Amino acid sequence: MAYILKATKCPTDELSLTNRAIVNVGDFPEEIKYADISPAPGQHFIFALEKTVEVPSGYVGFSLVQRKWAMVSINQELEVRPYRFDASSDVITCVSFETDFLQKKTVSQEPYDSDQMAKEFIMQFAGMALTVGQSLVFNFKDKKLLGLAVKSLEAIDPKSLGEGKDTAMRNVRFGRILGNTVVQFEKAENSSLNLQGKSKGKVVRQSIINPDWDFGKMGIGGLDKEFNSIFRRAFASRVFPPELVEQLGCKHVKGILLYGPPGTGKTLMARQIGTMLNAREPKIVNGPQILDKYVGESEANVRRLFAEAEEEEKRLGPNSGLHIIIFDEIDAICKQRGSVAGNSGVHDTVVNQLLTKIDGVDQLNNILVIGMTNRRDMIDEALLRPGRLEVQMEISLPNEQGRVQILNIHTKRMREFNKINDDVDNKEIAALTKNFSGAELEGLVRAAQSSAMNRLIKADAKVTVDPEAMEKLKVNRDDFLHSLEHDIKPAFGTAQEILDNMLARGVINWGAPVSNLLEDGMLYVQQAKAPESSGLVSVLVAGAPNSGKTALAAQLAKMSDFPFVKVCSPEDMVGYTESAKCLHIRKIFDDAYRSMLSCIVVDNVERLLDYGSIGPRYSNMTLQALLVLLKKQPPKGRKLLILCTSSRREVLEEMEMLTAFTSVLHVPNLSKPDHVLAVLENTDIFSKGEIQAIGKKMAGKRVFIGIKKLLGLIDMARQTEQSQRAIKFLSKMEEEGGLDMVARQ
């Protein structure tokens, strides 16, 4: 038998807390305790009934929570049918509720004992009808009202009872609870409710890691190892429930420092960490933006960054969401305290304020500070200790596999729209772009695109574009090779122009001494490359002035085929103070440590040390800096070859500098007529007859001249008339002391 009743509000708050449908005493017989209420065809909701005289006949009262769940409006006509539960199959053995405060604005950190809550719930609602998804209001010990949502219902499977098997449980859509029903409370997602006790179920938490992220979509390549390391150190603890973390006594990592050469992807990586995480949009702050001209405003700017996190931590406690704050160029505001001149001390107080916010007396556990810098050495040490920016990750230059990934990312759209030729092999380009950073690889792709576009532009009186450019435009292999040769050079690459300048005349093999020097030099190169080597090989190329030491060192550096070759020359430091010179030398070595294979050519060491024989005088500060750097081992896995040249070996020995070198290569002068003749044959200035005549004149004479001096005399002879060249050459050699025309005794 169906009744047609109109919906109305629940007459009193006390009746609302019963979570039952309120009907008039005269509308239903005493034995009917449950009703199937249907607000629309196909919709059925099972309610327990509460009979009272406070509801008019022909009406059924619902609380606001019940009306929302059953989608019932005031004065809506409802079809109400009496309902009877099956005593054997509809008895709920276990119910699980998703629990939160009914009114989210009035939250409390007061603990709620889930065991006591379960007992109280059974006392209040024994015999109650429940449906999965049903919303209820629960008043526990006059504390703040709780909102419950039925998450799951379990009942005994009657088949297992009939077959004599072990009792089996099955999930049901609705049922009624009895005095022995097990009640569990699970905290709702992002709820600040503090549940305690054994009747506490699983906590509903949103995974901190976004499920659909990947490096390719984020535009990041070659940083898989770094991301894995950051995840292990910084995010693994945040994946687990706060209760487990609390039981372990574990503290989350609050800070990450990303450092490394410019253009390697530090800022991109930090920006995309927010995409990787299910957290609030990160606050990205440029370091200098923090500083303010007004007293105290710089510190206030730091406090404002943490204000939201502090407020949420107080309100939600361990259930607070993660707040990410990213500092770009953090070295601008976190320099070593006491290192900045001036009496304002603004930088020092900003550092102090940041230290206290990250890990001070009132600790915040819901923040992650990410700092980025090229100059890790400038940052205050207190900021780098555990509890602050404790995860320090070097974002180094990508290896060949990483360069392939980066090139794939930057050429992806061209491949999608068929704007790149099949002859472009990213693996080949990656092999050619040693020590290129991510930004430089992106620049290389742009330069190749510009080269391809330029082919379709006609620059006559007017600049016109080929009308069929859309179809013709394709980037090919030659575009990449052209850009690699002319447009983009790596900051941590080979100083090719300087080496070519040093080798303007090449290395002339005038005899066995030169061959032996090149062979020995290549042995040191192989020693530096060898996996089992210590990682540091330093060689002094010593010899008389003008003997070709610089050219030999440059030739060895070029033959090494190291991706990073830098020249440290006194020419680049003219006018530098001692401290500026030391900083310049140190920067060259620091840059070398960032490459897997590096070679540094330190030319003319005694000039670098400001050595003067009258006095004598030298720069002790520069000497000590060089001694330290020559002996310093590069980081693990990095290899460094140092080639130094000097014309004053005895001076370096007095300065106790020779012991800093692995070995010494002695470059001799030309000491035999055959040596000079070999050079003359190589220069193609003198005819064979002239060379033979010069050989006869020099036979039995003492020869001692440097290759550089000899080449200078040959250039001078080039300007002389053909008939006088040989005579002029020999006379100048004698004048310069390179040839003693007196016969040997």
UniProtKB/Swiss-Prot annotation:
Tissues in which the UniProt entry reports expression: Nervous system.
Sequence positions that bind Mg(2+): T550
Keyword Repeat: yes
GO BP, sorted A to Z: autophagy; Golgi organization; Golgi to lysosome transport; Golgi to plasma membrane protein transport; intra-Golgi vesicle-mediated transport; neuromuscular synaptic transmission; neuron cellular homeostasis; neurotransmitter secretion
Main location (coarse class): cytoplasm
GO CC term (a single one): neuromuscular junction of somatic muscle
InterPro entries attached to this UniProt entry: AAA+_ATPase, AAA_lid_3, Asp_de-COase-like_dom_sf, ATPase_AAA_core, ATPase_AAA_CS, Cdc48_dom2, CDC48_domain_2-like_sf, CDC4_N-term_subdom
Record's cofactor remark: Binds 1 Mg(2+) ion per subunit.
Localization terms from the record: Cytoplasm
Keyword Cytoplasm: yes
SUPFAM superfamilies, A to Z: ADC-like, Cdc48 domain 2-like, P-loop containing nucleoside triphosphate hydrolases
First-tier enzyme category under EC: hydrolase
Alphabetical UniProt keywords: ATP-binding, Cytoplasm, ER-Golgi transport, Hydrolase, Magnesium, Metal-binding, Nucleotide-binding, Protein transport, Repeat, Transport
EC identifiers of the protein: 3.6.4.6
GO molecular function: ATP binding; ATP hydrolysis activity; metal ion binding
Family (UniProt): Belongs to the AAA ATPase family.
Function: Required for vesicle-mediated transport. Catalyzes the fusion of transport vesicles within the Golgi cisternae. Is also required for transport from the endoplasmic reticulum to the Golgi stack. Seems to function as a fusion protein required for the delivery of cargo proteins to all compartments of the Golgi stack independent of vesicle origin.
Subunit structure: Homohexamer.
Protein name: Vesicle-fusing ATPase 1
GN (gene name): comt
